[in-house]
Amino acid sequence: MKELKNVGKNSMDTVYQLKANTSDDGSGVVFGGGTHIAFPWPVNPLGEELALVVTIDCSVLNHKIGEELFPAGKVLSVFSTYSSDRYFLDDITFHGDSEELEHISKGYSRVLLSERSDDFINENYFGPISVEVTKREVNSEDFPAFSFVSKVIPRGLIGYGVLGDEYYFVAQIYSGDIPFDDGGILGLSDATGYLFLRKRIDDFSNAGVFFIQVS
């Protein structure tokens, strides 16, 4: 995995920023709303319906950024535990402990892959928000506090070595970028979510892993 590293003040990496927008720019990315899935709306082990954080039309976004970062022809949906009634941060937090990862993998977050032709379902906590995708250069010394897609692992992400070679990094989601619950869709407005996909996806209901970290 390529990582943003401190290799000199002029070292820059290209990422594609995700920013909520009032108009649809055809990016293929949506915060919230519903999605095309061939499965029931996912619930966590406590019986709580998960929040759909972001949906990606993979081919559209691949074309937008000019590289095959996501599985072509598919729809990627990222779900995470959310509750307005209880503290849920610990259910989706991972800092490199295998027990944390095992807990999340029980269903406290889900990464689903589907076909565009699958049924459209919307049981989400908040409505759809269009997302603008913009190319941006990031200094390798910086800690990017915004949402983006990229194959470059951002500085500040820790503990991902536990994932081994089975996954690859594709996106960072900054909770404060999503205008829902004062930016608290991931527990705190400064919580950062990280999305890794499996290099080989045999099960569309288990296409990757999504977790958060809080500094």
Show where each model-derived region lies.
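Preference for intrinsically disordered or flexible, low-complexity segments
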Residues: M1-S215
